[in-house]
Amino acid sequence: MQSWYLLYCKRGQLQRAQEHLERQAVNCLAPMITLEKIVRGKRTAVSEPLFPNYLFVEFDPEVIHTTTINATRGVSHFVRFGASPAIVPSAVIHQLSVYKPKDIVDPATPYPGDKVIITEGAFEGFQAIFTEPDGEARSMLLLNLINKEIKHSVKNTEFRKL
């Protein structure tokens, strides 16, 4: 009887494991989310697994043995409770497949009003307030210098959120 199971994949090999399992006629589910991150100094939307290194698979252990699944490239092991692989309820799989996250952001990405610290340049060590992005690779920060607030454009790689 077909059931859903949870696999733990080797680091960075989730996609490889999914491809090889799908070639063996195994249904796979790896829920993804889209995050807005600063990558190489530019603000971009990045698609990442909701559960890094975990892959939900549906198969019949009497047709495809668990050792075959376990020996697939990229797979580390089954998530188990005791000696046997844990069965994931179909209701959980259904909820994961229809789940559409809203406005998920990387906690390290600053937004207007967030406090940041400048890590490089002439104002290194100064605290500032993030006001707005200034193109793809820079941002406008509000610095308080001698009781006067000054807007200053800084590279996205030269500050971090507090």
Curated annotation (Swiss-Prot):
Interacts with both the nontemplate DNA and the RNA polymerase (RNAP). Monomer in solution. Disruption phenotype: Inactivation results in increased initial adhesion and biofilm formation. Pfam families: NusG. GO terms for molecular function: bacterial-type RNA polymerase core enzyme binding; DNA binding; regulatory RNA binding; transcription antitermination factor activity, DNA binding; translation activator activity. Belongs to the RfaH family. Keywords: DNA-binding, Transcription, Transcription antitermination, Transcription regulation. The gene is rfaH. This is Transcription antitermination protein RfaH. CDD domains: NGN_SP_RfaH (cd09892). PANTHER family: RHO-INTERACTING TRANSCRIPTION TERMINATION FACTOR NUSG (PTHR30265), TRANSCRIPTION ANTITERMINATION PROTEIN RFAH (PTHR30265:SF7). SUPFAM superfamilies: N-utilization substance G protein NusG, N-terminal domain. InterPro entries: NGN-like_dom, NGN_dom_sf, NusG-like, Transcription_antiterm_RfaH. Enhances distal genes transcription elongation in a specialized subset of operons that encode extracytoplasmic components. RfaH is recruited into a multi-component RNA polymerase complex by the ops element, which is a short conserved DNA sequence located downstream of the main promoter of these operons. Once bound, RfaH suppresses pausing and inhibits Rho-dependent and intrinsic termination at a subset of sites. Termination signals are bypassed, which allows complete synthesis of long RNA chains. The N-terminal domain contains a vast hydrophobic cavity that is buried by the C-terminal domain. This cavity may bind the RNAP and become unmasked only upon binding to the nontemplate DNA strand. One of its GO terms (cellular component) is cytosol. GO terms for biological process: DNA-templated transcription elongation; positive regulation of translation; transcription antitermination; transcription elongation-coupled chromatin remodeling.
